[in-house]
Regions:
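Catalytic cores of nucleotide-sugar-dependent glycosyltransferases that transfer UDP/GDP/TDP-activated
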Residues: 1-191
Length: 191
């Protein structure tokens, strides 16, 4: 699962509950599930464990190195649900998940959540864990399906991986200027 929100760590509404509830139910039914989300400013590093090494996510301008943290919770059947947090201060070390009260949408949200999506594949490689399905939620993680189809499926480890996108709130579509598209590290032909 990849999401911008998950309980009990980051929430603005029902999305966080849905992500954690579904992940927990799948774990309790014998599936191997991991949840990936950003380590926002409001998620204290004190409650997380630093994962060994950094991930390198290359965009067209620079190599971005992100730290990864982990945490876990117990499900209703006392199974362990693992969470992985992408930590990059420039994008996620600020108040608010998507923006602030005065500015509800950060101007760099496309870059922020693109980094999260690109990090997904790097983290899977680092864990040597290649899921059957990558389930993404809402516009912040919708890029996963594009990355999988046009880039990652060429790699043998993701050749059988499928993607699911669940929309929880159609009112938030992540519509930004097309001039920001290159910052997602996706070729123009896919615009």
């Amino acid at each position: 699962m990849i999401s911008s929100e998950a309980m009990p760590f980051a929430s603005t509404g029902g999305l966080a509950d849905a992500v954690t509830s579904l992940s927990s139910a799948l774990i309790d039914n014998g599936h191997n599930v991991k949840v990936l989300l950003p380590r926002y400013y409001g998620i204290s590093r004190d409650i997380l464990t630093l994962f060994d090494g950094q991930l390198c996510c290359t965009n067209k301008i620079e190599d971005i190195f992100v730290s990864v943290y982990t945490a876990s919770i117990q499900t209703q059947k006392n199974n362990t649900l693992e969470f992985y947090f992408i930590d990059y201060e420039k994008y996620f070390g600020r108040d608010g998940i998507y923006g602030t009260v005065d500015n509800p949408n950060y101007d760099d949200n496309p870059q922020r959540f693109s980094l999260l999506c690109h990090s997904t594949f790097q983290l899977c490689r680092e864990l040597n864990w290649f899921p059957d399905i990558i389930h993404s939620y809402d516009w912040p993680t919708a890029l996963i399906s594009v990355l999988l189809k046009f880039y990652e499926r060429k790699n043998p480890e993701f050749s059988n991986t499928k993607s699911i996108l669940t929309i929880h709130n159609l009112g938030f579509q992540g519509i930004y200027s097309k001039h920001l598209f290159p910052t997602t590290n996706i070729e123009w032909k896919y615009y």
